[in-house]
Curated annotation (Swiss-Prot):
Substrate binds at residues 134-138, 167, 180, 279. The lineage of its organism: Bacteria, Pseudomonadati, Pseudomonadota, Betaproteobacteria, Burkholderiales. PANTHER family: TRNA N6-ADENOSINE THREONYLCARBAMOYLTRANSFERASE, TRNA N6-ADENOSINE THREONYLCARBAMOYLTRANSFERASE, MITOCHONDRIAL. Its EC number is 2.3.1.234. InterPro entries: ATPase_NBD, Gcp-like_dom, KAE1/TsaD, TsaD. This is tRNA N6-adenosine threonylcarbamoyltransferase. GO terms for biological process: tRNA threonylcarbamoyladenosine modification. Keywords: Acyltransferase, Cytoplasm, Iron, Metal-binding, Transferase, tRNA processing. It comes from the Bacteria. GO terms for molecular function: iron ion binding; N(6)-L-threonylcarbamoyladenine synthase activity.
Amino acid sequence: MLVLGIESSCDETGLALYDTQRGLLAHALHSQIAMHREYGGVVPELASRDHIRRALPLLEEVMAQSGTRRDDIDAIAFTQGPGLAGALLVGASIANALALAWNKPTVGIHHLEGHLLSPLLVDQPPPFPFVALLVSGGHTQLMRVTDVGVYETLGETLDDAAGEAFDKTAKLIGLGYPGGPEVSKLAETGTPGAVVLPRPMLHSGDLDFSFSGLKTAVLTQMKKFEAAKLEGEALERAKADLARGFVDAAVDVLVAKSLAALKKTKLKRLVVAGGVGANRQLRAALSAAAAKRGFDVHYPDLALCTDNGAMIALAGALRLGRWPEQANADYAFTVKPRWDLASLAR
């Protein structure tokens, strides 16, 4: 089965072709970072308009890369939610228009299910079951994954997502957009232990997260720097130490909760997905913990940590392979800006 995947939930337009026999044939991605940078965040209307401009050229690109003709495609998968309503509507409209013109069925995909399954795109994918740590700008969750569509929420953030905390911390420190990669980069130059921040809910006894207090702690430190009238090199060094303290605190919590989830479920495999999953400090800490405690940890390729069409094409192929009745051939569709991943459980 050959599936075309279309991702447009936020500020990346991604298209890809996935074949159940040959794997990922081609994927192309356009990021809107440069367009949104001057606003310090994603502007939904601009995001939607850019998806309209970019989708068809990206389609031509993946078709040419893979030597695929429209007659070769068996189905079209698109991100149905969650995400920005206008952005989702663009991708859904394009998917269903192509499907109508080409006489193909469609299937709507949960954006987070795409992330959750993205590590299956590697050469040696992890077998089911496993624990999944989903860490992105909008979500932080621990899930027990028994099979495709068989998900149990073990824990989730009670306020800010981890990626949101990274972005807000970067803004407080005075870094550019997008903040997550910038604060991570700055943290690598900071001194470990120079600034020690709280580890929210580290000993809560459950698998939930909270990052709003960590963000507040960063703000408090910045006010201390201001009161001390730090400037120049001293201020830059203090900011680097603060970034290091923030990243260390966030990573400690993510690792500790992941270990607790593995212990609770008695599973030996952890899958990490979502944009924050590209963070080098997090990967290093989880890999070290895996080596020490004897479990396997799996990540998607770095290029597939961000939103992309490949994960949507894969999820579509897996769903249609298991549940052919999910194919939609009447081209009526809805989008779901808010959509609980656990609601997909079968």
